[in-house]
């Protein structure tokens, strides 16, 4: 793995010179190896180690290099034709491959090669970009988007129209992460490397980026970039210092433990807030 990383790191420093016409065979093979490992889940862009998320920047660099190395080409599809650099994850899948994968794909869902889809995942007509990781038992509902390198945990529900942001550039940024057992309400957007802690519920129409104020109603604390585990979050606003206007924020209205979360329906958690 260290040798693979060294090849990628070296090539990335001279990425502006790389074209589909001059790419070295060794680099092309190395990048293809990384993409294949991402595709099968043997390698992840980010992983939780000792309760902290660690991002492998060199893996993101390999994904970016893949765009430099390939020309767009004609891609046949069941409903249309396409013109892109990256093939569909399922371009060469047989019926047996789908059965072995253990997930459902409802047309016209689209998944790029280099994204991992785990057992018991359901993909409604949705989009999953390269480098993403969608773990077991997750539902990606209609018109939801899982962006490049985003990490989605086990038993997550991404409701209709949800956007989970991708972060390939700037390359030093961490990916957006939705931890296990989270519910993300319809049309909500979680972007820019925000982390949503496990067992959290995000209500419909909540938008959270790195500059979004996250207000804890119980403590009065304002934080950025991370939703604590077990949070129930709705959209709200906070007044300006001069009292003349209010600006958008996300409000943590309550926090529940995993036991309460498992026994309580989503609507019950959001009522009476």
Curated annotation (Swiss-Prot):
Localisation per UniProt entry: Cytoplasm
A GO CC annotation given for this chain: cytoplasm
Recorded catalytic activity of this chain's protein: (S)-2,3,4,5-tetrahydrodipicolinate + succinyl-CoA + H2O = (S)-2-succinylamino-6-oxoheptanedioate + CoA
Top-level class of the enzyme under EC nomenclature: transferase
Matches recorded under Pfam families: Hexapep_2 (PF14602), THDPS_N_2 (PF14805)
Pathway(s) served: Amino-acid biosynthesis; L-lysine biosynthesis via DAP pathway; LL-2,6-diaminopimelate from (S)-tetrahydrodipicolinate (succinylase route): step 1/3
Main localization of the protein described in the UniProt heading: cytoplasm
Keywords annotated in UniProt: Acyltransferase, Amino-acid biosynthesis, Cytoplasm, Diaminopimelate biosynthesis, Lysine biosynthesis, Repeat, Transferase
Highest rank taxon of the organism: Bacteria
Xref: InterPro entries: DapD_Trfase_Hexpep_rpt_fam, Hexapep, Hexapep_transf_CS, THP_succinylTrfase_dom1, THP_succinylTrfase_N_sf, Trimer_LpxA-like_sf
Entry similarity comment: Belongs to the transferase hexapeptide repeat family.
The name this protein goes by in its record: 2,3,4,5-tetrahydropyridine-2,6-dicarboxylate N-succinyltransferase
Natural source organism: Nitrosomonas eutropha (strain DSM 101675 / C91 / Nm57)
